Amino acid sequence: VEWSDSERKTLVSVWGKI
């Protein structure tokens, strides 16, 4: 599964909150 740059940034933000 390939994620776009924007989607990856969103994931990083969510993971950072955890």
UniProtKB/Swiss-Prot annotation:
Amino-acid biosynthesis keyword on record: no
Iron as UniProt keyword: yes
Keywords from the named record: Heme, Iron, Metal-binding, Oxygen transport, Transport
Source domain of life: Eukaryota
A GO term, aspect molecular function: metal ion binding
Tissue note: Red blood cells.
Family stated for the protein in its record: Belongs to the globin family.
Subunit field text: Heterotetramer of two alpha chains and two beta chains.
Record function comment: Involved in oxygen transport from gills to the various peripheral tissues.
Note: This fish has ten hemoglobins, 8 of which are anodal and 2 cathodal. The cathodal tetramers do not exhibit the Bohr effect, due to lack of the C-terminal His in the beta chains and to blocking of the alpha-amino group on the N-terminal residue of the alpha chains. The possession of both anodal and cathodal hemoglobins may be a physiological advantage for fish living in fast-moving water habitats. This fish possesses 6 types of hemoglobin chains, including a major alpha chain, a minor alpha chain, two major beta chains, and two minor beta chains.
Name of the featured protein: Hemoglobin subunit beta-C
Organism name: Catostomus clarkii (Desert sucker)
